[in-house]
Amino acid sequence: MKQINLITMAMICCMATASAQDSRQSSSIYLSPTTPGATLVPFALNSEGIKLPIRWGLDVAWDSEQNVRKGINHIGKDNISIMRSSFQTTYPLINDEELTASQKQKLDTRTKLIDIVGKDIDIVLNEDQEAGIVSYYVENGVANVDHWCKLINASVKWLNENYPKHKVVAISPYNEPDYSWGQGNLASFKEIAKKLKTEYPLFENIAITGGNTLNNDEALKWYNGLKPYVDWGNTHQLDGSFTNYANFFKTVANDGNYPYADELHNVGEAMIGAEYGIKMGIWWGFDSRSRGEFCRISNSGSRIGYAENRNAWTAASVYRDDTTNEIKAFIGSSERQANTSEFNFISKDRMVYFDGYGPTHEYTMSIPGGTDYQKGQTNAEKVIDVTWGEDVQPSIIKGRYRLMNKASKNVAAEYNSDNIAMVKAAKFNSTQLWDINPIDDRIGGDYSYHEITSANDGRHINVQNFSTYVGGNVMAYDGKNSSNEQWYLKYAGNGYYYLINRESNLYLMAASSSTTIGINVQQGALDTSTQAKKDLRLWKLVPEDAECETKAPAIPSGLNAKASNAAVRLEWNANTEADLAGYIVIRGDADGTNWNTIARKITEPCFIDNTCEQGKEYQYAVKAIDKSDNISRKSEIIYAMPTGDKGLIANWQFEESLADNTDNAMDAVSLNKAGFVSEHKSGEKALYLNNNYLQLPYTIANSDEITIALWTKWTNTSSGWQRLFDFGNGTDQYIFL
């Protein structure tokens, strides 16, 4: 049986609330207190999860080829099985039965866009009400049901005759009828649905969708009013409450009908829809990575975490790809109604890295909102890579770098005015130096990207003319951080990255592996068919003060371990390279599985692992890393485990320090700067907590038995439920005082 004793002495507490302070090299250096009040998103990597597959599609009612190609590049054709097109009420029918040339041309243009995705993709038709509604269809606010039905029938018939491989599976006779488009009332909508169902054989197997409202608060009224002729329940989320949005899809599902969202604007809407039952989602204007990653992983994986903040109109989720085992965390909002909020993602079963930040069990992400409806709104959304293993991103990317291509070892630089080309690396040449920073979370839409700005003149690495095609030219330009100037840095291993453009979802690459000066930089699809082709797309982000070279440091030697009752101290011989940046410590289970990086770029040849479990044996190894992010092979493996002996696990005296006085180095950190006062019970000082709190190491209470002793002077009487300590792993495992 594991037993620990914690002694915490001489605290003066007002209101419990810990600034991280300097600490020795133990696991505690990675502790990062989180701001209270964030919505918790707990997840377990190995949990069974929930499968929530959704049919995904794109919209050509807004007939933009750029929108379609962006969607294809981000989602992938294999994940697109439905498209939304439109019929037009802009012209009367010829002889009450035939479409005009203009109506046919518009259908043809839109269907050709659908053909880019696939020539046999299913189609939903809605009304293109924004193009106009002539009096042939609505006069004095009264819809002509016969004319409306004949138009829809003629449109479907024309598609069947001219594009027979496509199948029209559903019709939305009115689009956003709750808005002032002038389509007609609910009664006329129902009459149109009834007439199509009962008098037009063509519609025997074509679904009718409703309510199709702009405001999801109105959706249930328009949906219920169409019964029994409605098959799919549909709403937009351009206004309305979170609760009504969720309840609408629940109601449709409970009716045995098909929950459907034909105009998604944010991954938040999609996540919430998935929670409450949608089976199909169509993206209106397609943005980028968050939506594409969500479409892919929702159909190839399982959801292992979900949380929502209804007051802020935001939500978050975590998905696992069951084929690749990749983990993605998502955060999203209402396009027009969100308030700024925070989500705290908590990995319950192992320490991980969130977009390179870690190792940690928790990570807090803020998502920006506005002050009111369409005031200060950014339609914010983000996807976060959750990773682990013995080869993780070496550090957080933020600073000035050279971009060295793996194939040629040359670097990307401004070249001949506007071009970006491969040149020999040279110090003190600002044309080949790039400032790489995360984009502002208020940039608009997906903020999962970095900006790459020339240190020479402030221009950005820009995909020319917003190209979505393979071979698109890359240039230096200042488009004010437009979408074709934003890049996803995807870690590829061994210190290299893929750089993927937000607009095109294509990869930055050298056109050739030649070392000749002036080889063009362009974008291309991922190609890993040969190592040579893969290398053209791999980049090392070499810090400004480092050399562009690929020689790895020597393998660390002399690794040994000394166990204490709740930790393992590792020591090894120091490397002697002049450009050494530090060491990487990796740990695996005794059977050689579950390797993870437990320390990165630590500068001294020693480390105390206090995240290990008592009674469990581990393998340890160390790598060296230089300033150019060249990484050595791992050292010889050693085996070690905590002794598990009974006795003192942690002891904090708080003498101007939050350090633990035992060999376990269970150092604490504080949310805000820790204060120390002379009033004390023992020693010389006491810790003063006022609107502050300490975060202790995660394994501090991981024992079958625990004894806690502390001196506390409580000076606050105005607030209830103040805690002296609070340990927990969800609502079913906790202890507090």
Give the label of every model feature segment:
Residues 40-44, 58-220:
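Substrate-binding cleft and catalytic face of glycoside hydrolase catalytic domains
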Residues 542-547, 639-692:
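Extracytoplasmic low-complexity segments
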Residues 391-551, 665, 669:
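Lectin-like carbohydrate-binding module/patch detector with strong preference for beta-trefoil
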Residues 609-630:
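Beta-strand-rich modules
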